[in-house]
Curated annotation (Swiss-Prot):
The gene is mtaD. Catalyzes the deamination of 5-methylthioadenosine and S-adenosyl-L-homocysteine into 5-methylthioinosine and S-inosyl-L-homocysteine, respectively. Is also able to deaminate adenosine. The lineage of its organism: Bacteria, Bacillati, Bacillota, Clostridia, Eubacteriales. Binds 1 zinc ion per subunit. Zn(2+) binds at H67, H69, H213, D301. This is 5-methylthioadenosine/S-adenosylhomocysteine deaminase. It comes from the Bacteria. It catalyses: S-adenosyl-L-homocysteine + H2O + H(+) = S-inosyl-L-homocysteine + NH4(+); S-methyl-5'-thioadenosine + H2O + H(+) = S-methyl-5'-thioinosine + NH4(+).
Amino acid sequence: MNRLLIRGATILTMEGPEAIIETGELLIEDGWITHVGLPGSASGSFDMDEVIEADGQVAMPGFINCHTHAAMTLLRGYADDLPLMTWLSEKIWPFEGRMTNEDIYWGTMLACLEMIKSGTTCFGDMYDCMHDVARAVEKTGMRAMLSRGMIGIAPTADKALIEAEELARNWNGKADGRITVMVAPHAPYTCPPDYLDKAMNLAAKHKLGINIHLAETLTEFEDIKKQYGKTPVKHLDQLGLFKLPVLAAHCVHLDEEDMDILAQKAMGVAYNPQSNMKLASGIAPVAKLLELGATVGIGTDGTASNNNLDMLEELRAGSFLQKVSTMNPEVIPAYRALQMATIDGALCMGLGDRVGLIKEGMRGDVILLDTQQPHMCPRHNLVANIAYAANSSDVRTVVIDGKVVMLDRVVKTIDEERVMYEVRERAARLAGK
């Protein structure tokens, strides 16, 4: 049995706004959190494989990035300041068409490095060559929900379905259970009804959920209404998509009925505020969705449209954007923003029984943040300091599935210099430089 004790930290369990243990300790045994309490309260506290002294730090659940395209780190800064469809058709898709399996592996390795160093322990990914994405996840020690993005109008549509099924068979539940799989028809505007039906049948066959972009732009909203006589959400509802667990990314352009459907039927909505701002897609009505009872997590989207994977930045931007768009400073307060970036993100991906909280019986995905920094002083409100003042360099240590993957800012599972060298070389080749 492997026993890891984290001692002396203030523990933000995310079980409630007041569920904070000052100078506490938590014990992780064989990947499971088995004890959370006051110092010295863990049984056999002298018989540990590893002890982390965490005085002056906060222990909290790792951040959960509900929606990204990890390998797109290769495209960071390649194409900016363009409308979504121009950006995709003229820049992103041609670049991606030149990418090899190894390019995708190394791009994902860089994404995992960036996420670990900014406190993300789990992410939801939609992309191509997912075997290579899974290899990177397995090597780095991260947790991930992976899905092979499928474009139903592309010549590769049938091949993508085969690869999606191979991903499910080969990787669902692998890497000691850290990898789970969903089925990912790209979006209603790229997947006709007959193709969506094939995707739903595949998901039902393997008891998987659906991961899909939905109602991201006004163009999509209007085009789907013109083509099918319904909004994108109602179109998918009529097709029966929401009979399966659905993680819907973006959900920017919604009417009242759409919001009711998502609140009642979707497993979760992935809110991507910075990508939506950068691409001028609009502002998702998240405050209203939450009021209706929807489960909303936070995603960064890919680095080509953000341009980083920093969940602290994302949750802060997401909170502030809702405040100003509703002209109500009380919507999405600090604790709610942290919930969206942790336990609500886990629920969105069907992982709420495993991660997102620090409590006995959950897997040991924990981060330690340094609170002894000028921008974290004074401490009138710990939760507000984390949500509104902390930055990614405050993340000192990252534990995933009970294993220490970063200790005192040193990532133990990744050769940082090699990863950045590989990405620089490959990005230059792909860009034709």
